[in-house]
């Protein structure tokens, strides 16, 4: 049997993180700033933006260069704790 601590990923790897939040002019910039605390290589080329059909929400996919499970956990904690963020997948 495999260990609980074994990862399904081989690090380093590119890892997409999906973030949803209320539409705001600075949403994408703010989220990139949060993610850059953990991956300073994130820039506009690694971010996809999609508005919701009603325009009330914005979805982002930010692809980070993940170096460890701990790094991913830290990113998820920072994003889920941010007041502009509704959902992180």
UniProtKB/Swiss-Prot annotation:
Stored NCBIfam families: PRK02047.1
Protein name in the entry: UPF0250 protein Bphyt_0500
Organism from which the protein derives: Paraburkholderia phytofirmans (strain DSM 17436 / LMG 22146 / PsJN)
Taxonomic lineage of the native organism: Bacteria, Pseudomonadati, Pseudomonadota, Betaproteobacteria, Burkholderiales
HAMAP family: UPF0250
Organism superkingdom: Bacteria
Family: Belongs to the UPF0250 family.
Cleavable signal peptide: none
């Amino acid at each position: 049997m495999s260990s609980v601590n074994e990862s399904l990923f081989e690090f380093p790897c590119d890892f997409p993180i999906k973030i949803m939040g209320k539409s705001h002019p600075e949403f994408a910039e703010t989220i990139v700033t949060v993610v850059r605390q953990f991956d300073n290589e994130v820039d506009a080329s690694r971010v996809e933006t999609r508005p919701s059909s009603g325009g009330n929400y914005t979805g982002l996919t930010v692809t980070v260069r993940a170096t460890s499970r701990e790094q991913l956990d830290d990113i998820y904690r920072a994003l889920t704790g941010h007041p502009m963020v509704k959902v992180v997948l």
